[in-house]
Every structure is written in structure tokens, then in C-alpha cells.
Amino acid sequence: MENVNRIVAEGIAAVEAAQDFNALEQIKARYLGKTGELTGLLKTLGQMSPEERKTIGAHINECKNRFQTAFNAKREALNEVKLQARLAAEALDITLPGRAQEGGSLHPVTLTLQRVVELFHGMGFEVADGPEIEDDFHNFQALNIPANHPARAMQDTFYVENGDVLRTHTSPIQIRYMLDKKEPPIRIIAPGRVYRVDSDATHSPMFHQAEGLWVEEGVTFADLKAVFTDFIRRFFERDDLQVRFRPSFFPFTEPSAEIDIMGENGKWLEVGGCGMVHPNVLKNVNIDPEKYTGFAFGIGLDRFAMLRYNVNDLRLFFDNDLNFLKQFAK
């Protein structure tokens, strides 16, 4: 029995001295494995008398239990050390100041839209809105665009399954507003997203427009020129900005014009289209063209943003590059 006590004492001492799980498992194998020292003692019981086998066998089993208890305790201790080390590594210093959330900012196109609306609001225009998916009547027919007009072609317009379209301009907002209001005077600015099959450095399949409309008795082309010239000079903050109105054609206005401004390079730059509302358009919204006249104009807000912020590629606005967009934060 003295030999058994010595072996188990040495085993327990080795267990308590183990520094890691690998060493602990090796000690267990040395004493309780198939060829372990305590296991080997049990194999000698067959050589003993029944009385000795009973007494010594019970003692060996007791020693094995003591060893296993010491082993379990050491394993728990090593687990606790491992846990504490991990917690220490992951500990948060709650005395450190927090990181401030970086504030967002408005998109440059949104800033441009707001500036346009602000300027026209100051001239008595109210903001109107409408759906981005339009039917044929509001997007084409009511605006004096016949069935064979090139603007209806598949290569220019996004059609949906039921024949409706993604609006190609914000003019349908004007139609809906006039039909709803019934009677002039009407003075609105209609900003929003529009869609056309086009994509390059200065065009996008989705872009932003703002269209203005003024319908009232006695409105003339001179009023159109005065209003738009005042707006464009205020927008670019240049009282001496040269503006010209160049004859053009649109099915929904007559007469029609393209609007140009003088660029810093000394060349004319197109910034919009305009004209007197076509009598057929007024008839389509139940307004008497013999009594009322009106003008309409349209500008590309993305184009205005490019000019305002000196950006030469429209696609940069929609690449979601935060480093680029942060330049325009206010």
C-alpha cells in the first residue's frame, strides 16, 4: 500500500504543478492511461489472495478517485485562468471618451434643388409634386406629344408592362396640377426625378429636373425672360451674367426657346428649355387659351449642380464615393 500511496501522491503533485492543458493531459495519461502507473497496479491484483485483492483493490480505486478529483480541480483552475486572460484582453476602458458619430450631409444635387426651390418660392411659386410612374395621357397626350413622336420610342423611354412609363420629364406634374386646380392663376415649380434611356458623362438614366409654370391672363414671353433671367443670375450670384434665348421647338410650347448662359470660357452654354404654353395643352386641361396664356421652362438639376460645383462628370454624383461627396457638405 505504501507503493500505491507514493504513486498517487506523486501524480497529484504533478497535476497541481501542471501549467497548461497539454501538460495536464499528459500527466493523466501517465497515471490513468492503459499503461499508466495506477492502471498497472490494478493488473497486479490477480496475483494476490482474495483477501489482499479486496483490501488493496479498494485502496487503489480510492487513490484513483483522489487523482481524478485533483485532475478535475486543476482543469477548472486552468479554465478560469484562460477565461480571465481573455476577459482582460477584451476589456473595455469605460473611462475613454466615446467616438463621436460623424454627421451626415445633404447630397449636392439635393442642395441644388433646395436652392432652386428657394429662389422660385421667393418669386411666388409654390412646389408641386406627382408620381414617377405615369400614364400615356399625362406624360405624352396632354402635352401635345403625338403617337408618332420620337420621344415615345423605346430607345428613349422606359416602359412598364401595362404601357405606363417612368416619367420622362416633370411636365406631367403641371398637367395634374392644372386639372386639379381648374382655374388660373397658376404659378408652380415642379422638381423631381425623371428617367430616359441615356448614359454618359453628362447624362444619366435617372436624373433630376425642375420645371416651372405660370398661367394667368396677360402672361407674355417677356415675363418668361424676366423671371428666368432673374432666377439664373441669382442662382449663380452674378448680376452681369449674360443670358440668351435661342429659338427652338418643343411640342408643348409655342414659341419655344433654348436658354444659354455665357460660360467662363467665353462660350455659350445651354442650361434649359422654355416657351409659351401651347394652346392645345391648355385645352387638354380645360383652360381657355383665348383668355389665359402661360409660360413653362425646364432645367436639369444635375446639370446645374455640375455647373455650381465645377464637376465635369455627372456620374460622380451617383457613385456613392463619400470622399467626393464630403467636399460639398454644409
UniProtKB/Swiss-Prot annotation:
Protein name: Phenylalanine--tRNA ligase alpha subunit
PROSITE patterns linked to this entry: AA_TRNA_LIGASE_II (PS50862)
Record keywords: Aminoacyl-tRNA synthetase, ATP-binding, Cytoplasm, Ligase, Magnesium, Metal-binding, Nucleotide-binding, Protein biosynthesis
Similarity field: Belongs to the class-II aminoacyl-tRNA synthetase family. Phe-tRNA synthetase alpha subunit type 1 subfamily.
Cofactor descriptive note: Binds 2 magnesium ions per tetramer.
Catalysed transformations (reactions): tRNA(Phe) + L-phenylalanine + ATP = L-phenylalanyl-tRNA(Phe) + AMP + diphosphate + H(+)
Places the protein is found: Cytoplasm
Top enzyme category: ligase
Annotated GO biological process: phenylalanyl-tRNA aminoacylation
Binding site for Mg(2+): 254
GO CC term (a single one): cytoplasm
EC number of this enzyme: 6.1.1.20
The organism of origin for this protein: Neisseria meningitidis serogroup B (strain ATCC BAA-335 / MC58)
Recorded name of the encoding gene: pheS
Quaternary state and interactors: Tetramer of two alpha and two beta subunits.
InterPro entries registered for this protein in UniProt: aa-tRNA-synth_II (IPR006195), aa-tRNA-synth_II/BPL/LPL (IPR045864), Phe-tRNA-synth_IIc_asu (IPR004529), Phe-tRNA_ligase_II_N (IPR004188), Phe_tRNA_ligase_alpha1_bac (IPR022911), Phenylalanyl-tRNA_Synthase (IPR002319), tRNA-bd_arm (IPR010978)
Cofactor(s) needed: Mg(2+)
GO MF terms held by the record: ATP binding; magnesium ion binding; phenylalanine-tRNA ligase activity; tRNA binding
Pfam families attached to this UniProt entry: Phe_tRNA-synt_N (PF02912), tRNA-synt_2d (PF01409)
